Design a protein with these regions (language model features):
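Active-site loop immediately N-terminal to the catalytic Tyr-X3-Lys motif
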Residues: 24, 71-77
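Residue(s) in the substrate-gating loop at a strand-loop-helix junction
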Residues: 66
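C-terminal helical subdomain
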Residues: 104, 108-109, 127-173
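Active-site helix of classical SDR
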Residues: 46, 82
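A short helix-coil junction within the Rossmann-fold of NAD(P)-dependent oxidoreductases
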Residues: 48-57
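Short, small-residue-biased leader/transition segments that mark boundaries at the very start
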Residues: 2-9
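Substrate-binding pocket helix/loop in short-chain dehydrogenase/reductase
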Residues: 22-23, 30-33
Length: 173
């Protein structure tokens, strides 16, 4: 645990929208909004803490991606792409921090069917109905994610746990 005059120890990045639809629907406005929130939100969050973390040679960034950032599924090409970005960005942040000796720990979460407000951001009726059915059958509560975040935080300063896929045991993907 960090003590003393450290101004900022952790940054948790958890903003995202999922207005998923088939590519043929050409919802380019939704695409731009996903990039603005799902990618630029992470960039801006890290930019806000990186100077402090670098100066104090300590810190931890925890970001929420999605299983869609690990696996492709119809209707989520752009959403999945924004979540793949989070994976890539966090891994490069971890590598560069190690190379520069700044001791910034990173953790990326890949939630599956977790009951949150995210489903309310789906813009395509067919995609929304399918995801609602999936979540009704398999969804689990957000406290499962909170437990994983606590685990990542509780690790000693010299230990980095980088990636967690979290989902219902009954969910097939």
């Amino acid at each position: 645990s960090l003590v003393g005059s450290e101004m900022c120890i952790r940054d948790s990045l958890n903003a995202g929208i999922m207005p998923s639809a088939p590519l043929s629907a050409m919802k380019t406005g939704d695409w731009h909004e996903m990039v603005d929130i799902n990618i630029k939100g992470v960039l801006n969050g890290v930019a806000a803490v990186l100077p402090t973390f670098t100066a104090q040679k300590a810190g931890q960034v925890i970001a929420t991606s999605s299983v869609a950032g690990l696996k492709a599924y119809p209707g989520a090409a752009v959403y999945g792409g924004t979540k793949w970005f989070v994976r890539e960005f966090m891994e490069v942040l971890r590598i560069e921090s190690a190379m520069e000796g700044t001791n910034i720990r990173t953790a990326t979460l890949y939630p599956a069917a977790i009951h949150t407000e995210l489903l309310h951001t789906i813009s395509d009726p067919g995609t929304s109905a399918g995801m609602q059915a999936l979540y009704e059958k398999h969804g689990i509560t957000p406290d499962r994610i909170a437990g994983v975040v606590a685990f990542a935080i509780e690790q000693p300063a010299d230990t980095n746990v980088t990636e967690f896929t979290v989902g219902p045991t009954s969910q097939p993907w």
